[in-house]
Regions:
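Histidine-centered metal-chelating micro-motifs
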Residues: 46-48, 66, 84-94
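Ligand-binding loop in jelly-roll beta-barrel domains
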Residues: 89-113
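Conserved short histidine dyad/triad with adjacent acidic residue
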Residues: 20-22, 37-51
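Short acidic-glycine-tyrosine-enriched beta hairpin
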Residues: 73-89
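A cytosolic small-molecule/anion-sensing beta-strand core signal
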Residues: 61-62, 80-81, 99
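A short, N-terminal "cap"/entry segment at the start of jelly-roll beta-barrel domains
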Residues: 1-33, 37, 120-127
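Short, conserved beta-strand element in jelly-roll/cupin
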Residues: 40-42, 52-67
Length: 127
């Protein structure tokens, strides 16, 4: 049937592992209106404060992440294996891996800064 979008099948193990920093690697699957990311964070890894238009779901498969939410970072949430955090569009957040952590992030729309490698906030040093 012409006009019917084709389905696509993926295996994580077949996708390239991108080294973002010394303590963070990821694999990406991108569709027209969403993105799925498998993210590996070493214990102690810091994701500096940032915000984006993309709505985000973070599902922790292994380990745990501590999030600081909002411009002031006063809301603190620890997300452990089996738990999911929803971050609405344009909400500032930062995170720290409390253990070696594997998470799956869903973004809508896709994170074009991740795809075109303009996500420079990963390399900012935080105090």
């Amino acid at each position: 049937m012409s006009g019917t979008p084709a389905v696509t099948f993926y295996r994580w193990k077949d996708l390239a592992l991108e080294k973002v920093t010394d303590s963070l690697d990821r694999r990406l699957i991108t569709a027209e209106r969403m993105m799925l990311a498998q993210v590996y964070l070493k214990k102690g890894c810091i994701v500096p404060k940032h915000q984006h238009e993309n709505e985000q779901l973070t599902y922790i498969l292994e380990g745990a992440l501590r999030f600081w939410i909002g411009d002031d970072g006063k809301q603190e949430i620890v997300v452990k294996a089996g738990e999911v955090l929803h971050i609405p569009s344009n909400i500032a957040h930062r995170a720290q891996a409390l253990d070696d952590t594997l998470d799956v992030d869903v973004f809508s729309p896709p994170r074009w800064d991740w795809l075109n490698h303009t996500d420079t906030y990963f390399h900012r040093k935080e105090k």
